[in-house]
Amino acid sequence: MLDIQTHMDFAGQGKAERWSRFIITFFGIVGLVYGAFVQQFSQTVYILGAGFVLSSLITIPPWPLYRRNALKWQKPIDTDAKSSSSESGDEGKKKKKQ
């Protein structure tokens, strides 16, 4: 099967958000200026929509540039050792008086 990576690290998420904001803002300004120049609000909406589509294609998929800072995970805790130590620890505790 295909080995498709689906994660994005925290730095990549921030980068994707900045790119998304920049692209949509840029296309919004260009669309507003062009729409005012040709006196067609529909052109503004079309240009903004194109910016949204471009922004989505650039920022939503987890491209490799958004996965450069891999997270360092801790080693898993052995659940058998943890459960046996918590059971023995409960025996030594006193119950509250009511």
Swiss-Prot record:
InterPro entries from the UniProt entry: Spc1/SPCS1
Chief place of localization: endoplasmic reticulum
Protein name, as recorded: Signal peptidase complex subunit 1
Organism ancestry: Eukaryota, Metazoa, Ecdysozoa, Arthropoda, Hexapoda
Keyword Endoplasmic reticulum: yes
Alphabetically ordered keywords of this record: Endoplasmic reticulum, Membrane, Phosphoprotein, Transmembrane, Transmembrane helix
Stated family: Belongs to the SPCS1 family.
Transmembrane segments: 19-38, 43-65
